[in-house]
Swiss-Prot record:
Catalytic reactions of this protein: RNA(n+1) + phosphate = RNA(n) + a ribonucleoside 5'-diphosphate
Subcellular location: Cytoplasm
One GO CC term on file: cytosol
Annotated KH domain residues: 556-615
Name of the molecule in the record: Polyribonucleotide nucleotidyltransferase
Length: 693
């Protein structure tokens, strides 16, 4: 067993790459270690293309084992179940980073599995998994020449932090992950606290310059441990077939791409495709040698060339816009009468119905991870039904990876403006239903979420808007597109999503289909996105620019009380009897804390007020010189104990009773008396006198 090892430093932390010791049946196997974190990453490459495959079947699976943190899984089976949303998001992050590095037309299946074997809690293992995925690919024999690396960057007190730990990130205004090759940026994922575009760009460039160290280490490992390059073929469009279709149908295709409506354009293009198939199969140009798949791929290549060349030549885009124009926007709030908050955001042919629901602490999501169980007060879910693109399909299934990814992006975009628990005790769930989609539905979700929460009375710090930018690049010529359509996303080279407030960026996500982009393009895209974002915010602000002061009449009510911690036991009562009685009488939910915090959550104001009044009566403090109506709770030889407020009793001597002209032999337990608090001693004992009738 021969072990190969590479060691490098990243942010003053030593990282070790090692191969040859584990999982030797895989084509590529690398363990990545940093401190007590260990991630095993394997790559398996199929040596032939499966029949009928017309895409690159790359799959990435990031898995966390609970034993890595010295824990036993919960649940009846006591074993790991399906991957959590966080694990799915990390899988997507790795996939998006490495996918652009493979040659176009490479259709061999590749599966990458990253398994967290040991975890110390200080650093997230995601960057180690990304580095390991690249290293295992580099030694697997796959056609992976442009080695990719990734780093995380934070930003605190005006300084960038390389490879920040979890504590650093809690204090950071930025959580930025950048991946790329030695000379190009391929993927960006970030969450920020309304930072200027210049800081975001600086963070991306700062991250990129530190990739070289990692890439050099991977290359050194590959030089000594790589398997022979597999034999593979690259699928290519048949140029002769493409020329035949273009010579006969280019005019019709060109006219179809002047139709602004997506549905009408697709109807026209489908009719042309049908005619193309009939022509090729019935003509004398060796049409019968071609499959339907080959013909349609050649047709698609003509479409791609047409759309891209039009934009690069300065001609109008598919829907007639110039590169910087935003589609028409329509904003409505309060569109659903029975919900707590709602908004309908429409941008061109993309439409999101976003609904906000308010709940109590008991509605918070409990998220289990290697760090333990965390309470999540803000949830955002994204649904993409098939009818949104005019198709039939599966409905009501578990969310797909894309839906999870879009929801996470929208949540990260709005997280920076979401109020903390002290300022806003509600738990909030936001759901985005995509009713129509023609590009940038995740950014429509960002806008709709901001509007919906303001409609529900959630005190977000600032409205947030999002915009998707695109890129068409051919050699030195390029065009940056604002507010891209679905076809422009599909046929273009970049999907660059930017969300933020009027003050700066809160989230940024970039995916590249080509071999990276330059600083100049990044700067232009960020500036163009800033202008577009402010335009969208202006339209949103015309409808609502700050949260409503009161929640909806149909929304639940919540009230937070801070009482003397010693009084919590009085509110709860023996065996919980007192609090249960309040709940039964009012229908409210009551949560208490040893710190003295009491949360009252009720379906309406009447129930809440009743519960609050009952609690206030229990915890009220008696004061000297005040008169109270009490009840006798205990008879003694020398006097009686009278209950005043809640569990507070006072002592009333017989002498005081007789002095007031009342006979002591007529007193019984439960009898009402009006008494005056004469004094309260240092021990809290209360002495009473009887108020004369």
């Amino acid at each position: 067993m021969k072990i190969f090892r590479e060691v490098f430093e990243l942010g003053n932390k030593e990282i070790i790459l090692e191969t040859g010791g584990m999982a030797r049946q895989a084509d590529g196997s690398v363990t990545v270690s940093c401190g007590n974190n260990v991630v095993l990453v394997t790559t398996v490459v199929k040596k032939s293309v499966a029949d009928g495959t017309d895409f690159f079947p790359l799959s990435v699976h990031y898995l966390e084992k609970t034993y890595a943190a010295g824990k036993i899984p919960g649940g009846f089976l006591r074993r790991e179940g399906r991957p959590s949303e966080e694990q799915i998001l990390i899988s997507r992050l790795i996939d998006r980073s490495i996918r652009p590095s493979f040659p176009d037309g490479f259709f061999n299946e590749i599966q990458i599995v990253a398994t967290v074997l040991s975890y110390d809690g200080a650093f997230s293992p995601d960057i180690l998994a990304l580095i390991g995925a690249s290293a295992s690919l580099a030694i697997s024999g796959a056609p992976y020449d442009d080695v990719v690396a990734g780093v995380r960057v934070g930003y605190t007190n005006g300084k960038y932090i390389l490879n920040p730990n979890k504590q650093d990130l809690r204090d950071s205004d930025l959580d930025l992950v950048v991946s790329g090759t030695d000379d190009a940026i391929l993927m960006v994922e970030s969450e920020a606290n309304s930072l200027p575009e210049s800081v975001m760009l600086g963070g991306i460039l700062y991250a990129h310059k530190h990739l070289k160290t990692i890439i050099n280490s991977i290359n050194r490992l590959a030089k000594v441990a790589s398997k022979p390059r597999i034999e593979y073929s690259i699928y290519q469009i048949n140029k002769f077939l493409k020329s035949q279709i273009k010579s006969q149908f280019f005019g019709e295709i060109k006219n179809a791409y002047t139709i602004a409506s997506k549905q009408e354009r697709n109807l026209k293009l489908n009719a042309i495709r049908k005619n193309v198939l009939e022509y090729i199969f019935s003509s004398d140009v060796d049409g019968n040698e071609y499959t339907e798949k080959e013909i349609l791929e050649a047709f698609h290549d003509i479409e791609k060339d047409l759309v891209r060349s039009n934009i690069l030549e300065g001609k109008p885009r598919i829907d007639g816009r110039c590169t910087e124009t935003i589609r028409p926007i329509n904003v409505k709030i309060g569109v659903l009468p029975g919900v707590h908050g709602s908004a309908l955001f429409t941008r061109g042919e993309t439409q999101a119905l976003v609904v906000t629901t308010l709940g109590s602490d008991r509605d918070a999501q409990l998220v289990e991870s290697l760090d333990g169980i965390e309470k999540c007060r803000y949830m955002l879910h994204y649904n993409f039904p098939p009818y949104s693109v005019g198709e039939c399909g599966m409905v009501g299934m578990a969310p797909k990876r894309r839906e999870i990814g879009h929801a996470n992006l929208a949540k990260r975009a709005t997280q920076a403006v979401f109020p903390n628990e002290e300022a806003y005790p509600y738990v909030v769930r936001v759901v985005s239903e995509i009713l129509e989609s023609n590009g940038s539905s995740s950014m429509a979700t960002v806008c709709g979420s901001s509007l919906s929460m303001m409609d529900a009375g959630v005190p977000i710090a600032e409205p947030v808007a999002g915009i998707a930018m695109g890129l068409i690049k051919d050699g030195a010529k390029y065009a940056v597109l604002s507010d891209i359509l679905g076809d422009e996303d599909h046929l273009g080279d970049m999907d660059f999503k930017v969300a933020g407030t009027r003050y700066g960026v809160t989230a940024l996500q970039m995916d590249i289909k080509i071999k990276g982009i330059s600083r100049e393009i990044l700067e232009q895209a960020l500036e163009q996105a800033r202008v577009g974002r402010l335009h969208i915010l202006g339209i949103m602000n015309e409808v609502i620019k700050e949260h409503k002061e009161a929640v909806s009449d149909v929304a639940p009510q919540i009230h937070v009380m801070n009482i003397n911690p010693a009084k919590i036991k009085d509110v709860v009562g023996r065996g919980g009897a007192t609090v249960k009685g309040i709940v039964e009488k009012t229908g409210a939910q009551i949560d208490t804390s040893d710190s003295g915090e009491v949360k009252v959550f009720a379906k309406d104001k009447k129930s809440m007020d009743m519960a609050v009044a009952m609690i206030e009566e229990i915890v009220a403090e008696v004061e000297e010189g005040q008169v109270y109506k009490g009840k006798i709770v205990k008879l003694l030889d020398s006097g009686v104990f009278v209950n005043l407020l809640g569990s507070q009793d006072g002592y009333l001597p017989f002498s005081e009773i007789e002095q007031a002209g009342m006979k002591t032999n007529s007193l019984v337990e439960g009898q009402g008396l009006e008494v005056l608090v004469q004094n309260i001693d240092r021990g809290g004992r209360v002495k009473l006198s009887l108020v004369a009738r």
